[in-house]
Amino acid sequence: MEDRIGIVVGGGAPAREGIDLARPLINNEGHLDKIGIAATRLNATIVREALSDAGVSVSGTIPNRVDEAVLLLEERPVVVMGGTTPGHTTDAVAIRFAIASGADRCIIATNVPKVFGEDPKTNPEAESHDFLTHDQLQEIVGPAEHSRAGASQIVDPVGVSEANISNMTLNVLDGRNVDLIRAAIVGGEFVGTVVRGA
């Protein structure tokens, strides 16, 4: 069987802006999450259409659930999806998709080069990590709970907990560098943080 790739697209600025716009009107975090999820699905559609136009054999629809994505991955080598349900971010969706599809690792593309012990935007002296255990990463990101719609961390705490339970390797890297993503996918030299079980 040829290699298969599942891509889970986050909401980014459109999700945060939509949530911020709605927050004065909506007090329910689950309802605000739905706004973020809609943004992830829009972004996923953009990525899916771009890949299709480039000639990539990508699934024709954006799945709503991880089990649906796994079935689509049996039909096409590339599946693109966004968020699913309130209570977690697309990091958790990506980790669940990787686990359910039997992947050997889940690549988390972020906007920093590695996992840091503290936010490098607020502490320029924060220490970066090449390797961490799931437990160490959980300590950095906090307990496995969803705190607030639109919240952003290096990796979703809910997803970290699920990766730990399933012993799913996480490769956290700077998603702004396409060459790093390519190397992580094809097994080239990895630059980022590898997270594994103890």
Please identify what each model-predicted range represents.
Residues 1-198:
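C-terminal catalytic "cap/lid" subdomain
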